[in-house]
């Protein structure tokens, strides 16, 4: 897996407002870590709840951009570290412009 790729993930049963079950995620971890022996990967959760597109830093993706069946939103405030084995199938890699917007959103939410 590479930074900027959208994957289907099999997340555990959700607790509270945490993400769970089968859902798309965006790999945001740097590639040297993705290519290492580290067994985990940092992802941003993707949702079809378009109301979340209004939240600061979140990025709306069209179906063609994401490869998903519905327009979706990368929720930059919902970052999760998961075991790499939970990534089940690669959907596609985002192009430069939506990834640039995601990176801006990550800088905003992480204050870096």
Give short role names for the model-derived ranges:
Residues 1-112:
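Conserved functional hotspots at enzyme active or ligand-binding sites that engage polyanionic ligands
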């Amino acid at each position: 897996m590479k930074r900027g790729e959208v994957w289907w993930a099999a997340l555990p049963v959700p607790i509270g407002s945490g993400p769970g079950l089968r859902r798309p995620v965006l790999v945001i971890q740097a590639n040297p870590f993705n290519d290492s022996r580290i067994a985990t990967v940092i992802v941003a959760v993707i949702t079809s709840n378009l109301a979340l597109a209004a939240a600061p830093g979140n990025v709306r993706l069209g179906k063609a951009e994401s490869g998903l069946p519905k327009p979706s939103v990368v929720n930059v405030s919902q970052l999760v570290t998961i075991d790499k084995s939970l990534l089940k199938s690669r959907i596609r890699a985002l192009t430069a412009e939506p990834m640039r917007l995601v990176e801006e959103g990550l800088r905003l939410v992480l204050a870096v």
